[in-house]
Amino acid sequence: MIRPRAECLRIRCRWILPIGRPALESGWIGISGGIVTSLGQGIPPGPFIDLEDAIIVPGFVNAHTHLEFSNLQSPLDTSGGLLAWIPRVVAMRRQRDPHTVCDAITKGIEESLAAGVTAIGDIVTTEYPTKKSTDPQIVCLQEVLGLSPLSASRIQTMRTRLASLRSAGYRVGISPHAPYSLSWTNSHSLCTEASKHSMVMAMHLGEGPLEEEFTKTSSGPWKDLLQHY
């Protein structure tokens, strides 16, 4: 048993699930300065808070989400599959204003905290709300699409947005959308950009046989759809 440091907040409960080691029945956890510093079983040394039959687990991680959709009352219509769903997403995004999106993101952050989520990888397409000290850890991944070569102005716009998010206190990264919505040249350029600045990346991959057909042959239903954009 590791003894907690002085001035440590100790919490006892029925079960503690450290994830990296076996569960602790009748366990306790010590926290100093917002950091877990000790774990043990039985009665903790010194004062403690007893949560009785509760279970303590590490905060949940939502590694890939789109908080901008948090204000939807119900999911978008999925009839017709992914090829029909994508145009609905595009149409909805074009109808919204930045203030509505920021409100949706704020709502999503609040709901995440209420559900025990402490780290989020959010795909970002527009303005972002001001960071609060109570927010979970958020990695803002700037989404990029484009089959035609990315212009210097688009690259600069992306860099400006990332710099703004970084200065606001967010960790940032890049999200090349998907193989069917971004050319190989653009994907390579974005990977180089992310590597140069030590940024994380996220990408939609393996979303069905039609994606595989398009990436291998540059033909099929995906090609027909993309010709409209």
Model-derived features: positions:
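Active-site gating loops and adjacent loop-to-helix segments of metal-dependent hydrolytic enzymes
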Residues: 71-103, 139-142, 208-229
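General structural feature for long, well-ordered alpha-helical segments within catalytic domains
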Residues: 35, 97, 104, 108-109, ...
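Divalent metal-coordination and catalytic microenvironments
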Residues: 14, 29, 34, 53, ...
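Metal-coordinating catalytic core of metallo-dependent amide/deamination hydrolases
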Residues: 126-229
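A broadly conserved amphipathic alpha-helix scaffold signal in soluble, globular proteins
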Residues: 102-114, 118, 163, 188-195
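Catalytic pocket of metal/acid-base enzymes, prominently hydrolases
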Residues: 67-88, 111-120, 124-143, 201-203, ...
